[in-house]
């Protein structure tokens, strides 16, 4: 599911998305309003704030209102990291899946002005600043940098209950690769790609999830480089040699230099083939990228180039 939510579920400025020991945190202190009207005083859930004079509540804005905000303390967590979404095909309800230092939170945002915190799936092992979530066939697939975490599989149909603030349990734990930084899923093929684990030098690990409750590793790829993030698609771009092939676009780091993109044919999971590797100058940290809808362009996001180079 590729959806863009303009509901600000929470603010997670504390931790950067990349795992680097020397990550910097930038503090922005402007003369902003200090309070927003709460819709739930007991739980400090903040209500709607219109974008006026470039500010919605305490946040800069440009043409978008802040519909609501759930602070981290409502989840009884200290840090947030990543988020994904799920739309229930049975009733059209929309949910936010929020990565936390101690687990994953599930929030019903069908009415974005009155979000409902449904509960948390605790981390499989210990806390970590890094967690990533993707969805396939009404299941959430979750990895974390927490040691020994592996892959959690969670049946999202549990969210159809009217109960709130529950503590959930995962349906499956695949512990074959330990910790990992990221996960990508190609819904067309039913394969997940675990990224930045201890296997394959941190390269992608191929996991068959067509049966979500029975995931299993079928292979992987090592280019002697760490894959931080990836997008995997059934390619329908201008290069006819790879039409309908399953192609991985990876944001990589090689030899400590965080400046690489790899393009990999993963159609045959037993025999993945490198199509191209690209390195660029003035790099800070090759963080993530996304293809245009026509698969003609890959838009790369470097996390730190403006910070370290200017």
Predicted segments, located by residue:
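Positively charged n-region of N-terminal signal peptides that target proteins for export
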Residues: 1-4, 19
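Sec-dependent N-terminal signal peptides
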Residues: 7-8
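Feature marking well-ordered beta-strand scaffolds used for ligand recognition
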Residues: 18-310
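C-terminal motif of bacterial Sec signal peptides marking the signal peptidase cleavage site
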Residues: 13-16
């Amino acid at each position: 599911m590729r959806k863009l939510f303009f509901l600000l579920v929470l603010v997670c400025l504390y931790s950067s998305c990349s795992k680097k020991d020397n990550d910097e945190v930038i503090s922005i202190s402007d003369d902003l309003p200090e309070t927003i009207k709460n819709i739930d005083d007991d739980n400090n859930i903040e209500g709607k704030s219109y974008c006026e004079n470039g500010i919605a509540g305490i946040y800069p804005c440009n043409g978008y209102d802040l519909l609501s905000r759930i602070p981290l303390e409502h989840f009884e967590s200290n840090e947030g990291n990543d988020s994904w979404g799920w739309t229930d095909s049975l009733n059209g309800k929309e949910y936010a899946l929020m990565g936390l230092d101690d687990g994953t939170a599930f929030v019903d945002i069908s009415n974005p002005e009155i979000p409902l915190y449904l509960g948390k799936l605790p981390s499989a092992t210990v806390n970590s600043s890094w967690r990533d979530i993707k969805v396939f066939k009404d299941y959430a697939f979750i990895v974390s940098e927490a040691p020994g975490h592996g892959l959690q599989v969670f049946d999202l149909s549990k969210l159809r209950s009217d109960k709130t603030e529950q503590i959930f349990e995962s349906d499956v734990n695949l512990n074959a690769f330990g910790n990992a930084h990221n996960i990508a899923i190609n819904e067309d093929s039913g394969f997940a790609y675990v990224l930045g684990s201890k296997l394959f030098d941190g390269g992608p690990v191929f996991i068959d999830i067509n049966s979500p409750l029975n995931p299993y590793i079928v292979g992987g790829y090592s280019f002697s480089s760490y894959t931080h993030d990836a997008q995997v698609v059934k390619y329908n771009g201008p290069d006819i040699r790879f039409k309908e092939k399953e192609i991985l676009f990876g944001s990589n780091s090689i030899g400590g230099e965080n400046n690489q993109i790899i393009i990999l044919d993963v159609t045959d999971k037993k025999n993945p083939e490198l199509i191209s590797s690209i390195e660029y100058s003035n790099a800070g940290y090759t963080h993530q990228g996304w293809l245009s809808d026509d698969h003609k362009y890959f838009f790369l996001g470097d996390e730190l180039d403006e910070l370290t180079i200017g």
